[in-house]
């Protein structure tokens, strides 16, 4: 079953797991990131920006600071993963990043965890087979920990997580 970024966001709103940005049109932000990526913006990334996601649970979204005045724009962490063909999507709150894969050219690219301890040189583990599935997994993360879910609980939400090409899922990453 495939799920869109919009559907994932909608399903996270009811339990209050999703926080959205207030105000402002995403058009300038989308155009800015598209230009930064050389017009190679995955549809899921554009949908994510258009949804206005600020956080899912404790995971803060990584967004460039958009302003109509070019001299007031800031990329923030947006360029941090470009050398390894990824765009940062979320921070784990401890310096590591979740990044959307740009190397595959896939319509719905996977998302990987990049550890700051590795200096973001490679993906450490697969975090979701798509951005939509990552959103659902992040929304369930605290509950899974609190409930003591076994390794691999992510498969119940994201059945394709084990087929991500650049890194294994967390329970196989060692």
Where in this protein do the model-derived segments appear?
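A surface-exposed partner-binding patch
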Residues: 1-105, 163-174
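Short, surface-exposed, charged/polar-biased interaction segments
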Residues: 54, 66-69, 110, 151-155
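Acidic side chains
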Residues: 92, 101, 115, 142, ...
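Acidic, proline/glycine-rich low-complexity IDRs
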Residues: 141-174
């Amino acid at each position: 079953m495939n799920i869109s970024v919009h559907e994932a966001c909608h399903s996270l709103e009811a339990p209050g797991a999703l926080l959205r940005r207030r105000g402002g049109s995403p058009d300038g932000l989308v155009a800015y990131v598209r230009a930064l990526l050389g017009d190679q913006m995955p549809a899921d990334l554009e949908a994510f920006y258009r949804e206005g996601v600020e956080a899912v649970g404790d995971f803060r979204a990584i967004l460039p600071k958009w302003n109509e005045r070019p001299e007031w724009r800031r990329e923030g962490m947006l360029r941090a993963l470009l050398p390894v063909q990824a765009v940062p999507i979320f921070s784990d709150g401890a310096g590591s990043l979740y990044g959307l894969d740009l190397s595959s050219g896939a319509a719905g690219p996977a998302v990987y965890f990049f550890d700051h301890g590795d200096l973001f040189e490679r993906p450490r583990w697969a975090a979701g087979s798509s951005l939509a599935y990552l959103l659902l997994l992040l929304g369930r993360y605290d509950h899974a920990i609190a409930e003591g879910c076994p390794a691999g609980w992510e498969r119940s939400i994201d059945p394709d997580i084990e087929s991500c090409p650049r890194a294994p899922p967390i329970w196989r990453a060692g």
